[in-house]
Every structure is written in C-alpha cells, then in structure tokens.
Amino acid sequence: MANLKPGTGKTTSAVWLAHIFVQAGNSVLLVDADPSGSALEWADLAAMDPRLAPPQAAFPFRVVALPSRDLHRRLPAIAQADDVVIIDTPQLEDHAAIALSALRYADEIVIPCAPSPIEINRTTPVREEITEVAAARDQPARSAVLLNRCVARAHSTADAREALASLDYDVLGTAVPRLEVYAQSFGRPVPGTGRQVWRRVAHDLIERCPPPCPVRSGPPGHHLPAQAAQDHPRPRVPGITGSSPGGRTRP
C-alpha cells in the first residue's frame, strides 16, 4: 500500500485485506513499515478486546514492525514461510527512503485513492517514484489504484475511474464504499460485516498475478488452485501486498 500523503486508507486496506487472505487459508505476514506504527497499534488494541479468547484471535497472522530503509534486503528472510506479505508503507512525502525500499520489494503496488480530484492528482508523484524504482529491480512491479471511500450512487466514483484510466492507470474493478464499519474499525477486531467487499478486492489482485498463482482469494472451497505451489515459486502480491525470493505474494 503506497501513497504520497497520510490518511488515504493504506492501513485500513492493509489490515482488512490481511484478514481476507488468512481467512482464505493463506499464511499472511503484515509488515508495518510506517514509523507511526498504526497497524501494530491496531493489532495490540484489538488483542485487548475482552470478548476474544485467546487474544491472538484478533489478528490471526503475524504483524511485524519494519520501518527500515533496507526493508527490501531484510524482509526476504523474515517472510520466507509466508504466502502473502502485505506492507503498510509510510507516506512518501515524509518517509521516502522507507517507502521506496518497500516499493523495491513488492510485486504489486496498490495505491488507495478517494474519488476526488485532489487525491487523483496526488497519484502522479507515486507513479513517478514507481517508475524510478523500476530501474533497481529485475522486473517492474505491477501497480493499480484502489478506489476507496466511495459514496454510494455518486457520480464521483465513475468520474474518478474515467479520469484515472485517461492517465493510463490500472484501476481495480472493486471500489470500496465509504462505510462506518471501515472508518471505525481501527483498534478493534475486524468484524464479519463488510468483508465481502475486501474479498472482491483480493480477487481483483489475484486476477492480476501471472500464472501460476497459488494464493487463495476466497473462503475454503472458493479459491484459486494451489497445486502449482508444490512445483513453482509463488508470485508476490503487495502494497497489499511483497514476498521473499522464494516467491510469496506481496501487495
């Protein structure tokens, strides 16, 4: 997850998607690369919910803090056993070195963006950094915009999709609506309500992976084939989604 500014939904997207991928049967690692530590704080607060037994049920996957300028060198060893690695990056404008290191690691870079002219305009510096980082990679990462905080039945979502397409962005087919269940979810266990949207987002990301892509994107019995995992390295999905040289998916 990458963006120029804070407050664009990177942490919310990373946490909800991590729950979706683990629910589908994947081994998931959530990397909090933001010095503010919002994802790690969310996990800690959610574990205090008295309704949970055991506390680790709040976030049924590993969460590690790695706000490092050499994240792309250190993370492969940490993520070696994981199917999906999701990196919650800091804003580029204040922590460029850390964010760029994450961009060097990820296979797919997801840019959360509200359907507003100012946020669409701010995607341009992100794309410029992605292009620059590509020179330091063996092959360029995929990148796509995730429209979020969309108002139901408003023209702004379609207008934003059209504007981004005119700028040659890939835009994920699923748009995340502006709902209280997402806005108020920080610090709490992620509820069942509202997950279907994120399942569709996960499916959109998996659809973008070059085959074979063994990462599951839905509930058990409704996922992509994983047989190829035995014989082929796994692709990395990002922003949601980086991965290790062994081939995990990293958004």
Question: Which role fits each region the language model picked out?
Answer:
Residues 27-28, 85, 109, 141-143, ...:
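Hydrophobic anchor at the start of a short beta-strand
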Residues 96-117:
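Inter-motif core of Ras-like GTPase G domains
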Residues 123-138, 148:
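Conserved C-terminal guanine-recognition region of P-loop GTPase G domains, centered on the G4
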Residues 149-190:
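Beta-strand-loop-alpha "switch" segments that mediate conformational coupling across diverse proteins
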Residues 184-203:
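C-terminal boundary of histidine-terminating zinc-finger modules
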Residues 226-251:
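Long, low-complexity, intrinsically disordered segments
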